[in-house]
Amino acid sequence: MSLSIDVTSLPSISSSIYKNESSSTTSTLSGKSIGRSEQYISPDAEAFNKYMLSKSPEDIGPSDSASNDPLTSFSIRSNAVKTNADAGVSMDSSTQSRPSSNVGCDQVDFSFNKGIKMNANLDSSISISTNSKKEKSKNEHKSRKHYPKIEAESDSDDYVLDDSDSDDGKCKNCKYKRKYFALRMRMKQVAMQLIEDL
């Protein structure tokens, strides 16, 4: 039995994240979203990452976001996402710019300036071949020894039928006494033949 696995090339996953500043894709959806407080999320992820990495982990709290931390000056752009806890978020698109004040607005549009392109290729080959060869030995065709058959009916009168051979009198006056002794003698012969063969 042989097992061979041939992997011509391992799974190669190549991902490229790129920024496209010139064109922006606007997708519109309709639905509701629940927020706890009114907040704005800025799409400028690089500046937000720099800010979050500059703080110690103990100082980061729920108030650290792009809009409600006074130490950072993130401009709320026209394509920022606004959530309102009271009214929810309606995902209807709007091409107008967002108001910068705290006026309730339940319209959201998404503008994606980043694109993710992923490519995964899997080229592999698995071959399984099972070959079992039976080696025939010379002794396989050799005839087996045939031991003498034990016949249940034996009419030979060669056996002694006295009480000394009857296993302490357990088989006295039994109608199968002759067959019992014949069987016992045959078993002794078979046992002796087995011992000689070994």
Curated annotation (Swiss-Prot):
The keyword Magnesium applies. Residues 16-30 have a biased composition (Low complexity). Residues 16-37, 53-72, 85-104, 126-167 are annotated as: Disordered. Its cofactor is Mg(2+). Mg(2+) binds at residue 92. Residues 91-104 have a biased composition (Polar residues). O-glycosylated. Hyperphosphorylated on serine residues, when in dimeric form. Phosphorylation by host CK1 is required for the hyperphosphorylation of NSP5 dimer. The modification Phosphoserine is found at residues 67, 154, 156, 164, 166. Keywords: Glycoprotein, Host cytoplasm, Magnesium, Metal-binding, Nucleotide-binding, Phosphoprotein, RNA-binding. It comes from the Viruses. This is Non-structural protein 5. It comes from Rotavirus A (isolate RVA/Human/United Kingdom/A64/1987/G10P11[14]) (RV-A).
